[in-house]
């Protein structure tokens, strides 16, 4: 019998990731920082810490501006506000640059960047580079009162209703809805009922739903991205909701929510299987080759820390029917990421460009994963069901490309995100990705990622 041969690696699948620390963002915050959120199109990064938010320039890796005075306790979570009617929330057309903050004081706050919005948001490209360099924290001094005024944020509106701290918040892709979650076990959905399209119009939001089906703190909320063809077309959907929300909880479950035909927000699926608190979740942002609905990744405490969930496609397909279909959905766990972490996973980021996943947590480890080719035969994958019962497709396998230990020394790492590079060391500014981690040490650290 001939000796077994080693399989030849698939050249299309990355085999190794090398992480190299870049100079940290300046200045150091010297206090626990919770998360750093990149703007979807502009070279800006918002970091929540203490009672404020520091906005960094991705072009200079230094401070651009700060949001202070809106909260009585620490800012736990931050999100960039999409422009009304869609878009990216700043720059062209005179639309404001906006942020929302969630705090331990049980409120959420809406902020706007005052001054030349077009310059601040990069109208035409050159304006933002001048603005972020002007706002760099290099201690250059000599700024005029007028220049200082350009970088001011205004606290426009406070959203009250939660009984305890706001753990997470997220805007729907079009900006119409804002979801907030709290230690009070609830998810609130707010609707933007402002009349204008930006400029000097006042923010006006009203509560449209309070979702109280979780049995524990709701740690995170996330809206399914709508920029993917399969999400826009409603592939795999069982009714006409245009927005899909997922929530993760201390009760060890994830819930999926949609708006029904009567305009009520309802739970359409409960994802169970984690053996501990589900700390958060991430929707797949890269279009799937099989044209299916975006998958959902969840991460938690417990033995199995990171799972991938896939919506089971209805076996009815496009056959017309006069019967009203159930809003109930079936989601299957179709992948479990390899075990790397020794303690709770606090944060995962799923790149919309490459499909690579990065994770971090209380053990201070950073891990990067790639998805390997899925099995060709659905039956071999262990997924049950057929044309009649519906399927979620074949299961997939993931591999670890690389790890870093003690990413922030002895401190826990609270957040990780993929982020476009605009700094002088980038080979392809605005296209090349790096990782950014945020820790208990108050350091916001960028990492160069080399894939081979």
UniProtKB/Swiss-Prot annotation:
Gene Ontology terms describing biological process: iron-sulfur cluster assembly
One GO CC term on file: cytosolic [4Fe-4S] assembly targeting complex
Residues passing through the membrane, by range: none
Superkingdom classification of source: Eukaryota
WD repeat ranges, renumbered to this chain: 70-121, 161-200, 213-267, 273-319, 340-379, 411-452
Sequence ranges of Pro residues compositional bias: 1-12
Pfam families to which the protein is assigned, alphabetical: WD40
Region (Disordered): 1-24
Assigned keywords, A-Z: Repeat, WD repeat
Keyword Lipid biosynthesis: no
PANTHER family in UniProt: CYTOSOLIC IRON-SULFUR PROTEIN ASSEMBLY PROTEIN CIAO1-RELATED, WD40 PROTEIN CIAO1
Biological function: Essential component of the cytosolic iron-sulfur (Fe/S) protein assembly machinery. Required for the maturation of extramitochondrial Fe/S proteins.
HAMAP family according to UniProt: ciao1
Family: Belongs to the WD repeat CIA1 family.
Identification of the protein by name: Probable cytosolic iron-sulfur protein assembly protein 1
């Amino acid at each position: 019998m001939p000796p077994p041969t080693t399989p030849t690696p698939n050249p299309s699948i990355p085999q190794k990731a090398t992480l190299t620390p870049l100079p940290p963002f300046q200045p150091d915050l010297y206090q626990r920082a919770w998360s750093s959120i990149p703007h979807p199109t502009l070279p800006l990064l918002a970091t929540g810490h203490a009672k404020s938010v520091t906005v960094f320039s991705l072009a200079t890796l230094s401070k651009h501006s700060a949001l202070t005075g809106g909260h009585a306790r620490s800012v736990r979570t931050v999100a960039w506000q999409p422009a009304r009617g869609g878009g990216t929330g700043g720059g062209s057309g005179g639309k404001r640059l906006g942020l929302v903050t969630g705090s331990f004081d049980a409120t959420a706050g809406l902020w706007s960047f005052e001054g030349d919005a077009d310059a601040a948001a990069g109208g035409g490209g050159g304006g933002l580079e001048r603005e972020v360099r002007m706002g760099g924290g290099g201690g250059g001094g000599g700024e005029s009162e007028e220049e200082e005024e350009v970088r001011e944020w205004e606290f426009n509106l406070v959203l009250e209703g939660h009984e305890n701290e706001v753990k997470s918040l997220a805007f729907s892709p079009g900006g119409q809805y804002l979801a907030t979650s709290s230690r009070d076990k609830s998810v609130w959905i707010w609707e933007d009922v402002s009349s204008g399209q930006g400029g000097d119009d006042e923010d006006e939001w009203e509560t449209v739903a309070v979702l109280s089906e979780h049995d524990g703190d709701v740690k995170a909320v996330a809206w399914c991205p709508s920029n993917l063809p399969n999400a826009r077309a409603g592939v795999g959907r069982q009714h006409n909701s245009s927005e899909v929300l997922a929530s993760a909880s201390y009760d060890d479950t994830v819930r999926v929510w949609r708006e029904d035909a009567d305009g009520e927000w309802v739970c359409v699926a409960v994802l169970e299987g984690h053996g501990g608190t589900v700390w958060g979740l991430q929707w797949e942002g890269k279009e799937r080759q099989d044209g299916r609905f975006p998958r959902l990744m969840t991460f938690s405490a417990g033995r199995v820390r990171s799972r991938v969930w896939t919506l089971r496609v209805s076996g009815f397909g496009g056959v017309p029917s006069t019967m009203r279909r159930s809003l109930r959905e079936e989601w299957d766990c179709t992948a479990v990421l390899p075990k790397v972490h020794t303690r709770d996973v606090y944060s995962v980021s799923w790149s919309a460009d490459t499909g690579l996943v990065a994770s971090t947590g209380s053990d201070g480890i950073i891990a990067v994963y790639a998805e390997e080719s899925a099995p060709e035969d659905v039956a071999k994958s262990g997924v049950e069901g057929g044309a009649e019962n519906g399927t979620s497709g074949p299961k997939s396998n993931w591999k670890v490309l690389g790890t870093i230990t003690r990413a922030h020394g002895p401190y826990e790492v609270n957040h990780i995100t993929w982020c476009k590079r605009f700094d002088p060391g980038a080979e392809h500014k605005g296209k090349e990705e790096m990782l950014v981690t945020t820790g208990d040490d108050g350091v916001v650290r960028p990492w160069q990622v080399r894939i081979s």
